[in-house]
Structures are given as C-alpha cells and as structure tokens.
C-alpha cells in the first residue's frame, strides 16, 4: 500500500432537528396545553486513533464526511431522535489542523484516543418551553442549529523513539534491517527509501524501542529538494537522532565531512527544535576501510567535523546529554550490538526521568486539589469557651 502521510478532508456535523408547535388533543380535553417536543441533536464527527491503521490513504479518496441530522420533534411531548455520530479511524500520530485558521484541532498520540472534530447542532425547542402564565397557548418553536462544518488538514507524524537521518545511500535502511524485523528496500542507488519505515528493536521480553527511517536528505532539502524534506516532520516526535554518515564513499570526490555538515544545516533550516534534539554520530561502512587505516580515518573525520572523540571508558555511565560517536558496519553487523545497547540504556534513563517528572506533576496537582477542597478551620478567640 502506498504510504500517504497528508490529506485534506471536509467534515460536516449533523443539523439539529426542528422543534414543533403542537397541542394536546384528547377526548374530554377541549383546551389541552402545548405538547410540542424538541428536535434531536445533530450527530457529531469524531477522530479515533487506531493502531491498526497505518496511513491516511483512505482520506485521499473520500474527502467529505457528513454526520446524520437530528429528527424533528413531535406532539405528545415526543422529542426527536438524535443523529448518529460518525467515527473516522486514523493512524496513531495523526495531527489535525483547521485548514482555514491553522488551529490545532487534535493530536492523536495513543490508541483509542477519541476527539470531537465537528460538533452536531442543538435541537430546536418545541412550544412546550414557551408556555407561561400570560401565554397559555404558545405557537412559537425554534429551528435546530446547524452543525459545525470545517475543512481539516490531516498530517501523520510517525511515533518512534529513534530517528535516522543522513544522505541517500548512507546505509540507514541496511542498519534498520540489521537490528530489527523491518525489511525496507535496499539497493546501490540513491533514494531507495521512498517513504518512512519503522522497525522495532527488541532487547529482551520487556524492553524495546522503535526506529524511524526516512528518505535520505540532500543539500537544499529544507527548501524542497529531494525526497527527505517531506518526511523530516516524522523525526519531530523522536527522542534521539542517529546521524548516519558513509565514512568510506565509493566516489573519491565525495567529502563525508561536507555531507555531514550539510545534513545538520538542513536540519537547522527546517526546525530549530529538531536541530536541538540529542544527536549521535554513526559512522557506517567501516568494513570498506583497511583495518590499519580505520582508526586514523575516523579520527581525521571527527577532527575535521569538530565532533568530540569518546574515550574508551565512556561506554559505561555516559552522560545522556553528551554527543556520542559509533563506528559500525550495518552490512556485517559490526558494532550494531553495542549501538543498540547504548540506545536502550539512553532511553531507559530518559523514560525513567519522564516517569519521575509525571509523578511529581501528579503529586502537585493532587496537593493543589486537596488544598482547594479542605476548608480552613474557623479561628477561635481566646475568650471563647472550650
């Protein structure tokens, strides 16, 4: 199935049913009062996050969604039936904006999340509501309200813990194949990856993380060159970026340092926040270098690029904010085990910090709530009797 990560749809909530003007008419009751019921409310439109839906392709073909209208009221105090709601299932990670105002309507971050994106109109009032001491036989009633109608822009941002970025043919797809069960296309030409791929790396029965691989970037990507600029948004939700660099390019005219700097520059142009995310350097294809030249080549690259070199003892107890560098061969699995364990250790620390912060916020909220609920004890003067 083609990967579709953007769509534009029109949603229309149902109109509320009209209220009715009616009077009670029964045998032996010649002057029955008003008994007109209200109209039913219009159906609303909801967006529902579904982990079984992977793309927005359905919304490229069906662009208009209309909820059911409410039924009109009836006599004998009968209210109209409300219109049925409709639910639009979307992938987890979908962001919904109002296309006209740019307002954020919903951000679907977890399975089962349900957000109203168009509210149904209220039903009209029947004449039973207008009865008064001075108006015993009201004939007025109100029409139902129109439901919300809006044009929405849907944008899918994949949810992953780690994002891969680099030039085309840097070996990102080969890496994700080597450490996960994902099987993206791999070939010896640029732009083999045409859409984002996700791979789950399982360390044991309880610990795992998700890697996102996007099409390779080229210089000018932030302005629209190449394929990767469309998919950079998929890296915005990741917690760690792996900058994959081909340390041994076939073309002698290709400068790995220049290419690495170009990627960082495109990242900065696209999104300052994305540029500021934790980023590790992964030097791939070291198997293409003679063994006696590897250390010298890597050291020369890091010096020219201006990236700090790690000491041998940095593998344990590393600072999660410190930049790191790994040399691997994704094709031969050389160094990939050490890299995945380092990623898992990093994510364990980050997740533990996030849980700790969430617990602290919950405790603060509970304390504030208790402070509001608990009434202050009345002051007792010294002269009062016990």
From Swiss-Prot:
Domain Obg: 1-159
Residues that hold GTP according to the record: 166-173, 191-195, 213-216, 284-287, 329-331
MF terms in GO: GTP binding; GTPase activity; magnesium ion binding
EC code: 3.6.5.-
OBG-type G domain span: 160-348
Cofactor(s) listed in the protein's UniProt record: Mg(2+)
Pfam families in alphabetical order: GTP1_OBG, MMR_HSR1
Broad enzyme group: hydrolase
Cellular component terms per the entry's GO annotation: cytoplasm
Top-level taxonomic group: Bacteria
Binding residue positions for Mg(2+): 173, 193
Cell compartments where the protein resides: Cytoplasm
Record GO biological process: ribosome biogenesis
Keyword line: Cytoplasm, GTP-binding, Hydrolase, Magnesium, Metal-binding, Nucleotide-binding
InterPro entries given in the database record: G_OBG, GTP-bd, GTP-bd_Obg/CgtA, GTP1-OBG_CS, GTP1_OBG_dom, GTP1_OBG_dom_sf, OBG_GTPase, P-loop_NTPase
Purpose: An essential GTPase which binds GTP, GDP and possibly (p)ppGpp with moderate affinity, with high nucleotide exchange rates and a fairly low GTP hydrolysis rate. Plays a role in control of the cell cycle, stress response, ribosome biogenesis and in those bacteria that undergo differentiation, in morphogenesis control.
NCBIfam families, per database record: Obg_CgtA, PRK12296.1, PRK12297.1, PRK12299.1
Subunit details: Monomer.
Family: Belongs to the TRAFAC class OBG-HflX-like GTPase superfamily. OBG GTPase family.
Protein's recorded name: GTPase Obg
């Amino acid at each position: 199935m083609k990967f579709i990560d953007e769509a534009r749809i029109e949603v229309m909530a149902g109109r509320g049913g009209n209220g009715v003007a009616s009077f009670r008419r029964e045998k032996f009751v010649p002057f029955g009062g008003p008994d007109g019921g209200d109209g039913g409310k219009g159906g609303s439109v909801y967006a529902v996050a579904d982990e079984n839906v992977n793309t927005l392709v359905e919304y490229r073909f069906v662009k208009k969604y209309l909820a059911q209208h409410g039924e009109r009221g009836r006599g004998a105090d009968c209210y109209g039936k409300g219109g049925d709601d409709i639910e639009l299932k979307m992938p987890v990670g979908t962001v919904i904006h109002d296309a006209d105002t740019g307002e954020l309507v919903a951000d679907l971050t977890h399975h089962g999340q349900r957000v109203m994106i168009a509210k149904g109109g209220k039903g009209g009032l029947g004449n039973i509501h207008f009865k008064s001491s001075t108006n015993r036989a009201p004939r007025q009633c109100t029409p139902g309200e129109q439901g919300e109608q809006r044009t929405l822009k849907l944008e899918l941002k994949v949810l992953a813990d780690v994002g891969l970025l680099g030039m085309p043919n840097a070996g990102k797809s080969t890496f994700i194949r080597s450490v996960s069960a994902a099987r993206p296309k791999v070939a010896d030409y640029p732009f083999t990856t045409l859409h984002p791929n996700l791979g789950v790396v399982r360390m044991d029965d309880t610990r795992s993380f998700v890697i996102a691989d996007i099409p390779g970037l080229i210089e000018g990507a932030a302005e629209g060159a190449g394929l990767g600029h469309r998919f950079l948004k998929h890296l915005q939700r990741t917690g760690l970026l792996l900058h994959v660099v081909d340390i041994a390019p076939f073309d002698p005219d290709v400068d790995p340092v220049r290419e690495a700097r170009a990627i960082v520059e495109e990242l900065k142009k696209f999104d300052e926040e994305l540029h500021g995310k934790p980023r590790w350097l992964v030097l791939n294809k070291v198997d293409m270098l003679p063994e006696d030249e590897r250390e010298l080549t890597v050291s020369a690259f890091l010096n020219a690029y201006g990236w700090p070199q790690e000491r041998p003892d940095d593998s344990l107890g590393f600072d999660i904010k410190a930049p790191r560098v790994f040399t691997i061969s994704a094709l031969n699995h050389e160094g990939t085990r050490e890299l995945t364990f380092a990623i898992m250790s990093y994510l364990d620390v980050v997740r533990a910090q996030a849980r700790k912060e969430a617990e602290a916020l919950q405790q603060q909220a509970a304390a504030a709530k208790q402070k509001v609920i608990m009434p202050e004890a009345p002051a007792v003067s010294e002269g009062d009797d016990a």
